[in-house]
Amino acid sequence: MVTPVTWMDNPIEVYVNDSVWVPGPTDDRCPAKPEEEGMMINISIVYRYPPICLGRAPGCLMPAVQNWLVEVPTVSPNSRFTYHMVSGMSLRPRVNYLQDFSYQRSLKFRPKGKPCPKEIPKESKNTEVLVWEECVANSAVILQNNEFGTIIDWAPRGQFYHNCSGQTQSCPSAQVSPAVDSDLTESLDKHKHKKLQSFYPWEWGEKGISTPRPEIISPVSGPEHPELWRLWPDTTLEFGLEIKL
């Protein structure tokens, strides 16, 4: 992004991705004094890593709804557990199944960091603030895998799953999520609530509340970029879903 400004203008704000993509301010051919304003200059910039594209064009990452589940404090010890599902704009994964073999290919690229919690994050004492902490999930989602390159993300991707352990009859193991359930999404637009029922126990996969951090691993291995999701502010969709178990 290049925005023309003059010496009299206020500094501008530019939201960019990780600065490791661009070189440091080492070029001294730019105008250094007000009287040099308007002089012709040539600047060459070399990128160390391929850029990650966002949008609907081929080779770009697409937007999607990301879900997080938090526990709501119960009124009394005998009250049923209640959870709130909070959703916001994120990046669409190419693979949606937690047990898919494609995840295993990215294990060697697992970043260092705090592992995501094994339990559903609890709300803080202030009910208006969610527990937000960067963490590394047990498995990565593949955001892109084509001729443009392979991009993965180690942020948690909350989904509902059926626990089929010990079940004697047919049990669907696929996830059930507002991000992929059109009927549920449509009902949220009108009622903001939905009751989920199943003959099998529900489990919430990939616990934790963390931002997406896309990372290119092919044709070269690049750094994580935790700021890219902020480029979707104009299309952000946020809603709450109350679930009682």
Swiss-Prot record:
Residues of the region (Truncated surface protein) are 1-245
User: Where found in the cell?
Assistant: Virion
Found, by tissue, as follows:
Expressed in lung, placenta, testis, peripheral blood lymphocytes, and teratocarcinoma cell lines.
Q: Which domain of life is it from?
A: Eukaryota
Pfam families for this protein: HERV-K_env_2 (PF13804)
Alphabetical UniProt keywords: ERV, Transposable element, Viral envelope protein, Virion
Q: Which InterPro entries match?
A: HERV-K_env, Retroviral_env_glycoprotein
- Please state the span of the N-terminal signal peptide per the UniProt entry: none
Q: Quick check: keyword Aminoacyl-tRNA synthetase in the entry?
A: no
Per the record, the similarity remark reads: Belongs to the beta type-B retroviral envelope protein family. HERV class-II K(HML-2) env subfamily.
Q: Other comments? A: Has a type 1 genome. The HERV-K(HML-2) family contains type 1 and type 2 genomes depending on the absence or presence of 292 nucleotides at the 5'-end of the env gene resulting in Env proteins of distinct sizes. Despite their overall retroviral envelope structure HERV-K(HML-2) type 1 envelope proteins lack a predictable signal sequence. Subgenomic RNA transcripts coding for full-length envelope proteins have been detected for both type of genomes.
Name the job this protein performs.
Retroviral envelope proteins mediate receptor recognition and membrane fusion during early infection. Endogenous envelope proteins may have kept, lost or modified their original function during evolution.
Q: What is this protein called?
A: Endogenous retrovirus group K member 5 Env polyprotein
Species of origin reads Homo sapiens (Human)
